[in-house]
Swiss-Prot record:
E.C. numbers: 2.7.7.27
Protein's name according to its UniProt entry: Glucose-1-phosphate adenylyltransferase
Span of the signal peptide: none
Function: Involved in the biosynthesis of ADP-glucose, a building block required for the elongation reactions to produce glycogen. Catalyzes the reaction between ATP and alpha-D-glucose 1-phosphate (G1P) to produce pyrophosphate and ADP-Glc.
Annotated organism of origin: Corynebacterium jeikeium (strain K411)
Family: Belongs to the bacterial/plant glucose-1-phosphate adenylyltransferase family.
Residue positions binding alpha-D-glucose 1-phosphate: 164, 179-180, 197
GO BP annotation list: glycogen biosynthetic process
UniProt keyword terms in alphabetical order: ATP-binding, Carbohydrate metabolism, Glycogen biosynthesis, Glycogen metabolism, Nucleotide-binding, Nucleotidyltransferase, Transferase
InterPro entries on file: ADP-Glc_PPase (IPR011831), ADP_Glu_pyroP_CS (IPR005836), GlgC_bac (IPR023049), GlmU/GlgC-like_hexapep (IPR056818), NTP_transferase_dom (IPR005835), Nucleotide-diphossugar_trans (IPR029044), Trimer_LpxA-like_sf (IPR011004)
Catalytic activity: alpha-D-glucose 1-phosphate + ATP + H(+) = ADP-alpha-D-glucose + diphosphate
Pathway named in the protein's UniProt entry: Glycan biosynthesis; glycogen biosynthesis
Cited PANTHER family: GLUCOSE-1-PHOSPHATE ADENYLYLTRANSFERASE, GLUCOSE-1-PHOSPHATE ADENYLYLTRANSFERASE-RELATED
Originating gene: glgC
Length: 405
């Protein structure tokens, strides 16, 4: 696919991800494993690359080592042809300080924009699960003559109170941008639906540069893209909404069209995994016309089931061994071992976990390299689990990496 040389893509990957603790205790949220083989950042990078955008800067900050390593190992493009996906940590170009917000992160990285001199700049988040062809959004942005275009997700109006909400006119021009309003405005064609901001933006380059510089001089600003930059451009009449429901991705089905999940909490992260494992999944990882790319599994052998080991309604990644154990309604990352008599149900298991002989694990997320001892019981006795582990509001047992339980 031809590289779109007049567009620079910036992926915001510097957030701490506190609500996803303990899985962000030692890594940035975009580096959290997802769906067996992937990291969260693989979804946005796949969308950009599949659409032909090969100049991508990933702005990082907190606990970025595993994220930087993943990008370096999994996302190598040809520098000889001007293609790159590069992690960019805080450079402290404007003083000895870290990024103070998403807008400040881009402001401190404007040298990248000046080097490329793009006409348009894509600014996407790094921690959502979805498929999207961003080229369609770019074309709508150009057609509208917008300064910024904001991707809008149609959600039931009663659920929109949890989002930044867009009020737009019949021509998709944004009239208001409201943060978690008690009375969300509806979309023009449906009184029961609102536009929630997806945190994905397309800017005319000079518009973004000017807005960032103005924002940097505002002492009352939090220097946030959604909270400060977008409202500034809305007030000027330069902001438009892009209706995500109009986006078409090759190979999509009616069931997974328009799928988008913010997995910023443990319960949302868990439920997004459960979306993957039905016979006709709500989100289909097997769409090869718009693949989710990664090199995470390397040269691992196929999963192996021995001594009557079984897995039902589950995803089991390469290198796993199920030996006379049972796995149901679960997602297993690579190199997971389930020993004889062990039972795993309704779980998300990250790489390198060993479930010991006769252990029972229910309704849990277990991070990398955890060893569950023989005969251990997790997710059955909540009172006992609360004394040992983190438990989400939805009752998901959370076990951090590199421990023996």
């Amino acid at each position: 696919m031809k590289s779109r040389s007049n567009v620079l893509s910036i992926v915001l990957a510097g957030g701490e991800g506190k609500r996803l603790y303990p899985f962000t205790a030692d890594r940035a949220k975009p580096a959290v494993p997802f769906g067996g083989n992937y990291r969260l950042i693989d979804f946005v990078l796949s969308n950009l690359v599949n659409a032909g955008y090969y100049k991508i800067c990933v702005l990082t900050q907190y606990k970025s080592h595993s994220l930087d390593r993943h990008i370096s190992q999994s996302w190598q493009l040809s520098g000889l042809t001007g293609q790159y996906i590069t992690p960019v940590p805080a450079q402290q170009r404007l003083g000895k300080r870290w990024f103070t917000g998403s807008a400040d992160a881009i402001l401190q990285s404007l040298n990248l924009v000046y080097d490329e001199q793009p006409d348009y700049i894509i600014v996407f988040g790094a921690d959502h699960v979805y498929r999207m062809d961003p080229e369609q959004m770019v074309q709508e942005h150009i057609k509208a003559g917008a300064g910024v275009t904001v991707a809008g997700l149609r959600v039931p109006r009663h659920e929109a109170t949890a989002f930044g909400v867009i009020q737009a006119d019949d021509d998709n021009k944004i009239e208001q941008f409201l943060e978690k309003p008690a009375e969300p405005p509806s979309v023009p064609d449906d009184p029961e639906v609102s536009f929630a901001s997806m945190g994905n933006y397309v800017f005319t380059a000079q518009t973004l540069i000017d807005a960032l510089k103005e924002d940097s001089e505002d002492e009352n600003s939090n220097h946030d893209m959604g909270g400060d930059i977008i409202p500034r451009l809305v007030d000027r009449g330069e902001a438009y909404v892009y209706d995500f429901s109009n986006n078409y991705v090759p190979g999509e089905t009616e069931r997974d069209k328009g799928y988008w999940r913010d997995v910023g909490t443990v319960d949302a992260f868990y439920e997004a995994h459960m979306d993957l494992i039905s016979v006709h999944p709500v989100f289909n990882l097997y769409n090869q016309q718009w693949p989710i790319h990664t090199a995470e599994t390397g040269n691992l052998p196929p999963a192996k089931f021995v001594k009557g080991g079984i897995a039902q309604s589950s995803m089991v990644s390469a290198g796993c061994i199920i030996s006379a154990g049972t796995v149901r309604n679960s997602v297993l990352s690579e190199n997971v071992v389930v020993e004889e008599g062990a039972s795993v149900e309704g779980c998300v298991i990250m790489p390198g976990v060993r479930i010991g002989r006769g252990a029972v694990v229910r309704h849990a997320i277990i991070d990398k390299n955890v060893q569950v001892s023989a005969g251990e019981i997790i997710g059955v006795d909540r009172a006992r689990d609360q004394d040992r582990f983190t438990i989400s509001k939805g009752g998901v047992v959370c076990i951090g990496k590199n421990v023996v339980v």
